[in-house]
A protein has these predicted regions:
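Alpha-helical packing segments of well-folded alpha/beta enzyme cores
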Residues: 19, 148, 213-217
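Alpha/beta-hydrolase-fold serine-hydrolase catalytic core, especially in secreted/extracellular enzymes
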Residues: 65-66, 131, 155-164, 172-173, ...
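Substrate-gating cap/lid region and adjacent catalytic-acid/histidine neighborhood
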Residues: 5, 36-40, 44-205
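Glycine-rich, phosphate-binding/catalytic loops in enzymes
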Residues: 14, 102-106, 229
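Short, charged, surface-exposed loops that flank catalytic or proteolytic processing sites
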Residues: 25-40
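Flexible "cap/lid" loop of the alpha/beta hydrolase fold
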Residues: 2-23
Length: 266
């Protein structure tokens, strides 16, 4: 549910440059601290200082050890682990961040990198939504999560001909706060692992959906196929955008972001 990290290539010197900045910032003189000297620094001080310098978050870093080339290039060439896959995205990946000041800073940062240059080109593809908040959520969720995840699914199912199933998690819990958050980033995880915390309004409907999802995931692990008696999950085929929607009801559908992803051409 975070395919966005493969979509943009960063300068592989940036992590090294930032590491040097950190070593200099923590130094009491003008010389960068060595790794052994850094190990002597209080971890909390390192963390606070690192948060001022490192802003790449979950971006993949080409370190020439674990990652030797851009992740997207690996997917394009089929240079990845040969496994079947369940992959998906949520309806409101970006919604709860939109009014948050930290989100605004993140957007400004990504804009500087040229990541959102194409957003203005897709206004017509989001005009079916009722308000600006929904449109912004749709555009950013599609760019950062949905479309890159479909790219991964396409490559896994075509380049090495593995079996892939794509889900769209659309279930919104009951309550005012839940309505504000929507089907937020990671909303499916309590259902997959049956970890509904006390603060989450959990209904019988949610408990039923939990059993369905767990049985489906377990069947996938046992047999390589997530289909069980209660669901008919279509196998992913490149560029068709067929998904299983986990919502109040389970249903197969063409993903809402299909036209957007085709226009984005990730």
């Amino acid at each position: 549910s975070a395919g966005w990290s493969i979509s943009y290539e960063l300068d592989n010197e940036s992590p090294a440059e930032n590491a040097l900045k950190l070593a200099l910032k923590l130094s009491s003189n003008k010389e960068a601290l060595s790794i052994n000297e850094l190990r002597m620094i209080n971890p909390e001080k390192i963390l606070v200082t690192a948060n001022e310098i490192f802003k790449l978050g979950y971006w993949s870093v080409i370190d020439n050890h674990s990652i030797k080339k851009p992740i997207k290039e690996s997917f394009a060439k089929g240079d990845f682990h040969n496994v079947d896959l369940i992959i998906g995205s949520n309806a409101d990946e970006e919604l709860m961040y939109i009014d948050n000041e930290s989100f605004k800073e993140l957007v400004e940062e990504r804009e500087e990198w040229g990541i959102y240059n194409k957003v203005i080109d897709f206004e017509d593809l989001s005009n079916h939504l009722e308000n600006d908040l929904e449109r912004i959520n749709f555009v950013l969720s599609s760019i950062n999560y949905v479309c890159p995840s479909f790219y991964i699914a396409d490559q896994v199912s075509s380049v090495i001909n593995n079996k892939v199933w794509f889900y769209s998690f659309d279930k919104v819990r009951f309550g005012k706060k839940a309505q504000e958050m929507g089907a937020y980033h990671g909303a499916e995880l309590p259902y997959i692992f049956d970890t509904h915390d006390a603060w989450l309004p959990t209904s019988y409907q949610d408990e039923y959906l939990t059993k369905i999802i767990q049985n489906s995931w377990l069947n996938f692990m046992k047999t390589g196929n997530p289909n069980i008696d209660e669901i008919a999950w279509p196998r992913h085929k490149p560029s068709q955008f067929k998904v299983l929607s986990f919502d109040k009801e389970l249903n197969s559908k063409i993903h809402d972001s299909k036209d957007f992803c085709l226009s984005l051409n990730i």
